[in-house]
Amino acid sequence: GLFGRVNYNYKQKYHASFTIRRDASSKFGKNVRWATFPSYAIGYTFSEEPFMDWARSVLDFGKIRVSYGKSGKQFDQPYISHGLLTVSSPFLGHPTVQPEWSQGLMNDKLTWEETKQFDLGLDLDFFQHEVNITVDYYHRLTDKLLYNITLPGNYSGYQRQWQNAYAIVNSGIEFMVKWDIIRKEKLTWNMSFNIARNWNRLKKSTNGMDFQNFNGVENFNNNLSVIGKALNGIYVYKDKGYYNSESEIPSYYLNGTRVYTYGSNIYQF
């Protein structure tokens, strides 16, 4: 891989940084193993401006940060894009060299899992830097996530294949306060408080399916992920309550005989 970075600082007020990476991995197919990952960041230290003189007795430092970047991740398994062959049984303690069958469908289009992230932050220092406040907002899109999907039908005897099949969005806010209660030469005591809130949702899934279970079993339990909704949501039938007596159950056989059901939910469809 290759790596480069350029930094710029003007009067300790205006800051800019540009970074670019060009990486390759033999884990991927030969036509998709190279990828470029740029990132950009700018900062504005507004506390150095003359118009902030009125607040200098309280505000020591104030800075706004904005950044955007793209990064890549390799999968752990080194050969799933190339396919694996199983050799025949050992002969006199040594495995033979004749391959017998493939352990799965190869996919030479498997490539990097990509993450694109936007960040907006604010840094504030008060009272001779005794109190520090940091606020951050982020929006992160993780695309081309690796998953062993179920193929339609029975393709060449194999029912599943590894693909770059999912995209997930995370966004959130982080807030932190740090307070130096005691700042002496031989004694330092500080406290910090932080709180964060994250929202996530499934951006897309295999074959555009609305419901997808990440455990590999589709639509067979209550734990599902729906496109546009939070991951791993719990979905159940909506009901009106419970029958309290037999007389409330409007169920009959074709011959007119009542069907007796005990303790059943009243479902809405």
Annotate each language-model stretch with its function.
Residues 1-238:
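Extracellular/periplasmic, surface-exposed regions of secreted and cell-surface proteins
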Residues 245-246, 269:
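Alpha-helix N-cap recognition
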Residues 246-249, 253:
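Core catalytic ATP-binding domain of two-component histidine kinases
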Residues 254-255, 261-269:
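Short, intrinsically disordered, charge-balanced linker/junction segments flanking boundaries
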